[in-house]
Amino acid sequence: MKIAIDAMGGDHAPKAVVLGAMKAIKEYSDLHITLVGKEEEIRQYLTSEERITILHTDEKIESTDEPVRAVRRKKQASMVLAAQQVKDGVADACISAGSTGALMAAGLFVVGRMEGIERPALSPTMPTVDGEGFVMLDVGANVDAKPIHLYQYAVMGSVYAEKVRGIKNPRVGLLNVGTEGGKGNELSKQVFAMLKDAPINFVGNVESRDLLQGVADVVVCDGFTGNVALKSLEGTALALFSMLKEQLMSSFTSKLAAAVLKPKLMVLKDKMDYSEYGGAALFGLKAPVIKAHGSSNDQSIFSAIRQTREMVAKEVIPTISSVMEKEPLQ
């Protein structure tokens, strides 16, 4: 199995990418990795070249670049070349912690959209209080969506949850303003009616306040709603940890309490740590394309590689394609 990785994407590239790649190589004996980027910079952190290949390029896509224009004009950019490796059949999948918009453009224009899928979806795995997490899609690939798009998201998310996350008969929920069937806007009502008859375990509407309680294994929504929900959850978690730290450091007594509570607090932190869940998959493409978090450290990159490897090994893309071919709504 071969995975191409944009070594220059992300806040801590290429160090985090190289270290994460070496960690993955040690863990998985069947894995080969191509690091795409500036060879001189990559070699500063590369201590072993076992099953690791460097594809040199001086060009990269910057966060300030307009995504579509950058992908079309910067043909030799590390992200574009990683995607090209997939298109050419040299790699089975690709990963980047670079610009989300650029990676979506590279996925569409270079890797290509899966036949029958109208709109790809960006799907991270979000943490829950029980540590199991849930798949959420879409969180920003498409801010405007039609009922058929959300229907397809539900099917793709269900396949992923079962194949990669090992959840038997995963529960699929529709993010809405209430749990009753008649709630929401016209889009939500139409999607609800469609999902009731879908070949998935649809559990109905779910509210954003219940997401972290693990009410569903797959949560479906349009990209605008999903992005707002995602950033609200991230912001709330950061604020709570910040307030907790401030209070625990406010006096000598509270500092003593913090020392006693530290092991439990670390368990809580690990449960809510995005780095353990891998990256956000771009569903609806011809091959796995994974968006790692922009601030990924080496553990985050390792988790994204582990996730990508599972997608390839469990044949997620062929399974989604097969399921979609059988669907009467295409």
Swiss-Prot record:
What compartments host this protein? Cytoplasm
As its record notes, the protein acts as a catalyst of:
a fatty acyl-[ACP] + phosphate = an acyl phosphate + holo-[ACP]
**Primary localisation category:** cytoplasm
> Which Enzyme Commission numbers does its entry carry?
2.3.1.274
GO terms, molecular function = phosphate:acyl-[acyl carrier protein] acyltransferase activity
Q: Give the matching InterPro entries.
A: FA_synthesis, Phospholipid_synth_PlsX-like
Signal sequence region: none
Alphabetical GO biological process terms: fatty acid biosynthetic process; phospholipid biosynthetic process
Report the pathway entry.
Answer: Lipid metabolism; phospholipid metabolism
Provide this UniProt record's keywords sorted from A to Z.
Cytoplasm, Lipid biosynthesis, Lipid metabolism, Phospholipid biosynthesis, Phospholipid metabolism, Transferase
A cellular component annotation (GO) from this entry = cytoplasm
Biological role: Catalyzes the reversible formation of acyl-phosphate (acyl-PO(4)) from acyl-[acyl-carrier-protein] (acyl-ACP). This enzyme utilizes acyl-ACP as fatty acyl donor, but not acyl-CoA.
Q: List, alphabetically, the PANTHER family matched.
A: FATTY ACID/PHOSPHOLIPID SYNTHESIS PROTEIN PLSX, PHOSPHATE ACYLTRANSFERASE
Assembly and interaction partners = Homodimer. Probably interacts with PlsY.
Name the protein family: Belongs to the PlsX family.
Its recorded name reads Phosphate acyltransferase
- What organism, scientifically named, is this protein from? Bacillus anthracis
Please name the gene that encodes this protein. Answer: plsX
